[in-house]
Structures are given as C-alpha cells and as structure tokens.
C-alpha cells in the first residue's frame, strides 16, 4: 500500500527528511530530475515549461535544465525575471538554468504563449505547488486556460496548477494534465472532488532512498490499495467445500416500490462467492422477487399498507437472521416505522451486519443529533459495515457538510472513533471511495464514471455481503477485505463500460461481470507483484 498525504503531512515529512540529511535544495534537484525523466519517456523534441513564483517553479527550472542537457529544445515561460523570483531556492536554480542553453520568455502575451505551446510536443506545468488555494490571478488566469485550449500533452509537477491539493477543489480554472508527476507521496486532493478529472495518470517519485523508513513517522491521510495487496483473496476454492462453508448471506431489503434493489443485491452476493443467499422482503413484493431469483429462497415478511416492512417485521426478520453468517440490510427497504424497527433489531443481533442505503437513513432518523453522538446504538462485537454515499453520510453526522474525499473521511472517522471498535468500518462512497476503520483509511481502485447509475450501490452492497460471508476469518484486516470488494465493483464497472459504452451502463450489467472482474483483478495482482504464469515468455 502507498501512503497518501495531506499538505501538512507533506511539510512534516520534508522536515524529517531534511533532519535526516537531505536538504530542501537537494529535494528540489531530485524532483526536477524525476520530472524530466518522465517527460523524456514521451520522446519530445521540444518542451515548454511554465513556472511560477515558488518552489514548484523551482522544480520546473531544474527539469528544464536537465531536458536541455539531454538534447531537448526547451522554452521556459516565467512571470518575472529569474532574479526577481521571491522563493530563494527557486531563484537560485532559475539563475543557473537561465544561463544555459534554454530560451526564457518573461510575461508573454496570450498570442505569444499560444505560439510557444504550438511549437512544443509537451508542456510542463510547474506553476503552483501544494500550497495553492483560492482564485487565480494574472498572468496565471490567462496562462492556464490557454494551455488547456492549445496544448496536446501536459505534464504537471506535483499537482495540476489551480487544484487545491488538500480538498481537490478547483475554484476558477485548472490545468488539465495528461500526466501528473507527484513527489514523495500522492496528495489527498489528487483523489478528491475535481482531482481525478484534472490529474490524468499519476506517477509518484519517492525522491528519498530511505523514504520507507521515515514515512511512518507522519500520520497518513490515507493509503492507496495497490493490486498486489489483494492477491490473497484470489485463492481457488478447496475441492471439498460445500455451499454452507462458502458462507451464507441474508438480504433484508426491498419494498413494493423498490423490489429490484433486493434482487440486484442478492444476485451480486451470490456472484461474489457466497454459497447460500436468501432474501427477507415485505410480502407485498416477495412473489415478484421469487420469480426473478429462482435459485434463491425468499422469506415473505409482514408489510405495512404501503408495501414496506410492517410493525411485525422486526421479530420475524431477526429470528431468520440468526441462522446466517452475514446480513445485508437496507437496499430499497424505505424508512417506514417497521423498517426502522428492523434496523434497530438487527443491530442487537450477534451476526456480521452490513447497513446500506435506507438502513442508514433509518439510523439517521433514529439519532436525529447524529449517530456519532449515540455510539451505543451501533457499538457491537460482530463486524459492522456502513456504506453511505456523501449525502447519506452527511445525514448520519447530523448535517455536517460532506462534499469531497477529505470531508467524507473526516465524517466517517467521527462515526468510527465514537464507537471505538476495530470491527466497525465505514465505506464512504464517492468518485474515490474511502474505507475508514478506527486506525486506517484505505483507497481502493476507483471505478469509471459509468458506475454513477441507479442500483450500482445495491450491487456493491451485495458484493460486500458475499465477500464478508465468504472470508470471515479476515478479522485482523477488515479494511483490506472491503477494499477487495470495492475493487471488484470497480473492475466490473470497467468491464461494463467496455461492453456497453460508458454512458449506457445500467446496474444489472455489472452483476454477470463480477466473475470476469475477479479474473482481471487476480491477473493485475500477480502482475503488480511481478509474478508471471509459467507459460509466459517474460
């Protein structure tokens, strides 16, 4: 796993590295060298480097110097003369580079900048670093849209200029990079809000050869789950296994209005590996669900006049749930009074539980001042997983603003830390999904935009249930297990986008692609670890 840092954590880590003997000036040289080497992989004949006033610009000056030494024609666009750059380190390398075989253009007009961009094979963005926030000012408010309109290939150093490295928010405009070469560790803003849209492919340069020894000296905002981290979850089934030892799941879901949610969750749990899946649904929709799921038993639960779980549902559901290895509650169940009673009853059972969708909305209605103010309501010995998207998560913490990855992680941690249980994990769903446990936050593979479709969350909930039921012995690493499930959902999303087109994917497309997604994920895990098939030519 690869740490993801906040801007404050990056500053602390650089200070530690400096105390260990590598100065900020040396880090700038290493950053510029790494960026230059990544640009050289694109085989450019001519490169345009845009620099700003600070140390990110210094990285750009160093990169320009190295590219020139490698035989690349280099133009540098600067807002001021090298001697006028306010940052001391950047001013030093700018003076040095300006005396070499490069062309420096100070404060060009828009037309002059367009000409320079048109000549370049690659544009290097070294305008702003991780300290940028707020609004763009001239000349950068002119440079950035001009680059976006005219450049064919942009490589940003550390973060795309205009992006808030902490929140991922773009207030005005931002460089749209094909590649972002980030230094020491990825920044949290690259995965949050607008970050993924503007950053392009991410490449991380460690810069410091003892980074692994010191990076744990600072807290991590999160960690990226890499394909090889999941390799243990792709082991083949034992030949002597039976359906019950593969794990049993009860799906408590559905209503007359939303029967499909229960159907999709149940099918997904089965496709994810559970050996025995059953559904407990209101009797108003039970027959419809039975017809759609011929291989899955369906329990008809007393319903109310609107076809949701009724007043007698709690006792019936809880009695059934005791017999299962895992319970998923919530998809399509509404927030009726009976549904709220079912949720509170399941929380009291000694069984692994996943709360999704309306089950979370029921919780929010029960605890109107935020569930983090009522941790006894959800503190339990058995595993508990909550899967809110941003709006649901905001309701759970009584309206705290949740609109990007950083605020989602903060809200999820409020819920987890209030309970103080190693068995509680909140999966904050978004463009980048965060798996938040009491001690760590993991960022698994993000899926395509096509996953933003109704019912996609029901499929993910089913995958989580099937995964938890099948692998309950993973008690020491719940977050990684759930990262595996989220990654499968993402892989299925990519497969569906390829099969049907990004804009045409519907949630049911994902279900039959869960199996193929496992195969692709397993292959990626082996490749990430450098393990090849015996028949490979490599």
Predicted segments, located by residue:
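Internal gly/pro-rich beta-alpha loop/helix module
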Residues: 121-122, 127-220
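Short acidic loop-to-helix transition motifs that present clustered carboxylates
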Residues: 108-111, 161-165, 188-189, 359-362
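Short secondary-structure boundary/hinge segments and terminal tails
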Residues: 84-85, 112-115, 164-165, 287-288, ...
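Generic structural signal for alpha-helix starts
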Residues: 86-87, 115, 137, 160, ...
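Small-residue (G/A/S/T)-rich helix-start motifs and N-terminal tracts that mark the onset
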Residues: 1-79, 179, 190-357, 361-386, ...
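Nucleotide and nucleotide-moiety/phosphate-recognizing core
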Residues: 37-127, 135-157, 342
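Short, flexible loop segments at the rims of nucleotide/cofactor-binding pockets, characterized by
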Residues: 101-105, 131-136, 303-308, 330-333
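Short low-complexity, flexible loop/linker segments enriched in glycine and/or proline
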Residues: 90-92, 170-172, 292-296
